[in-house]
A protein has these predicted regions:
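Start-of-helix register in tetratricopeptide repeats
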Residues: 18, 54, 90, 126, ...
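TPR/TPR-like alpha-solenoid repeats
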Residues: 26, 47, 62, 83, ...
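Hydrophobic face of amphipathic alpha-helices that form TPR/SEL1-like repeat modules
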Residues: 22-29, 58-65, 69, 94-101, ...
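N-terminal segments that cap or nucleate solenoid repeat domains
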Residues: 1-31
Length: 419
């Protein structure tokens, strides 16, 4: 495209705001003329000083981003305020963001909310999404799920991917609206089409489970792959599972290990755990107990309760690591406090035997009581053997301790511990 720079510059020099804006935009993107941020800034300032809300809003955003100018939130707010007062919705939304984050001004959630409302009423999709978020989380306003879904849906209808995902979540869970799996899946799909990884991941789960759509392993695989290639760790992990079990794709342990490894690089505990299982079971690699133990250790250190229990078993047996009952007990405790019933059971047994920690029937009974959530006959049998060695006062203390553990860690709340 040929630009008549002389004519456009003459018009801009004469005070033609539209010419000034056009010239500023051309210099900013280098369209038809060499890119020149200095000239772009010069013409945006000219138009802004003549009262152009569009130029004022753009100047504000340039100062926020530090593009062509030093980053300066105070100056950004000055220009955004001028444009916002002229009902420029993009300026109002940006100004709201500054108040929300406390950038260039004191943080003021109430003022941020008010500016988002003004921008949203003028049709700004981002402001509508932020209003939905604020209502959904009681952020700067009383929580109101009905208002949240209303604003999310308005933004979603304008093609805002995050709003589409959140609207989908609310329809799937029936929050603020009647539960509607089909509508939830529809919004996941819209967001997924925009390349939004979390939506692609959710859509894959929808197809895998047949929730709101016809169950389809191939579609589940397709969308997990999309999300995984966008770097979403949960999708990378799930894609590994699909390859491992041959769901929607031929079983391929090498591909499973590849995707588990990528998820593990983002410190995803479940991925470390699966890598440990693959090395322990010789799936796609030689059986290697030492390597397996290393992965279980990493999974356990990331806080994954299942791995903490498994690592405890390895230390108990000296499998891939040196036998260490005290370390085993430490890992059982960590898993037990997260509600892992197997760890609770084994910890109870260890307290009864004094293996790796002190012999303590009260603590043994307390953990065995909590492990009853698993409804395992063996667990009940062991509990009976332990209580047979205790008097009524000790049993009362054990029940009291179990109740305190429930309250402190918020675990195994289905188990009724009668004090």
């Amino acid at each position: 495209m040929t630009v008549d720079l002389s004519s456009l510059t003459a018009d801009a020099d004469s005070g033609d705001i539209e010419a000034q804006l056009q010239l500023a935009e051309l210099y900013e993107i280098g369209f038809g003329i060499p890119m020149d941020h200095g000239q772009a800034l010069y013409w945006y300032r000219k138009a802004a000083n003549l009262g152009s809300a569009k130029a004022q809003a753009h100047l504000g955003r340039l100062f926020i981003k530090g593009e062509g100018v030093p980053e300066d939130y105070v100056e950004a707010i000055r220009w955004l305020q001028l444009a916002a007062d002229q009902d420029d919705p993009s300026a109002q939304a940006s100004l709201a963001w500054c108040y929300q984050k406390g950038m260039g001004t004191e943080r003021n959630i109430k003022t941020a909310f008010e500016w988002y409302v003004r921008a949203a009423k003028l049709g700004h999709a981002g402001a509508r999404y932020n209003l939905g978020y604020m209502y959904a989380n009681g952020y700067g306003v009383d929580r109101d799920d009905r208002m949240a879904i209303e604003w999310y849906t308005k933004a979603a209808e304008q093609g805002h991917p995050k709003a589409q995902l959140n609207a989908g979540l609310m329809y799937v869970q029936g929050i603020g609206t009647t539960k509607n799996l089909e509508e939830g899946a529809r919004w996941y799909l819209e967001a997924a089409k925009h390349g939004y990884a979390k939506a692609q991941y959710n859509l894959a789960l929808v197809y895998a489970g047949g929730h709101g759509v016809q169950q389809n392993d191939k579609e589940a695989f397709r969308w997990q792959t999309e999300a995984a290639h966008h770097g979403y760790h949960r999708a990378q992990f799930n894609l590994g599972l699909l390859y491992m079990h041959g769901l929607g794709v031929e079983q391929d342990y090498a591909q499973a290990m590849k995707w588990f490894t990528l998820a593990a690089k983002q410190n995803y505990g479940k991925a470390f755990y699966q890598l440990g299982k693959m090395h322990a079971g010789g799936m796609g690699t030689d059986t290697n107990e030492i390597e397996a133990a290393k992965y279980f250790q990493m999974a356990a250190e990331s806080g994954y309760a299942k791995a903490q229990y498994r690592l405890g078993r390895l230390y108990d047996k000296g499998q891939g690591v040196e036998c260490d009952h005290a370390l085993a007990a430490d890992w059982y405790k960590k898993a037990a406090r997260q509600g892992n019933t197997r760890a609770q059971y084994v910890l109870g047994v260890h307290y009864a035997r004094g293996q790796g920690l002190e012999n303590n029937l009260i603590k043994s009974c307390a953990w065995l009581l909590l492990s009853q959530e698993a409804n395992d006959p063996l667990y009940r049998e062991v509990l009976q053997k332990v209580t047979a060695r205790m008097d009524d006062e000790q049993i009362h203390e054990a029940k009291k301790l179990a109740h305190n553990i429930q309250e402190e860690y918020g675990i195994n709340l289905k188990v009724r511990v009668n004090q």
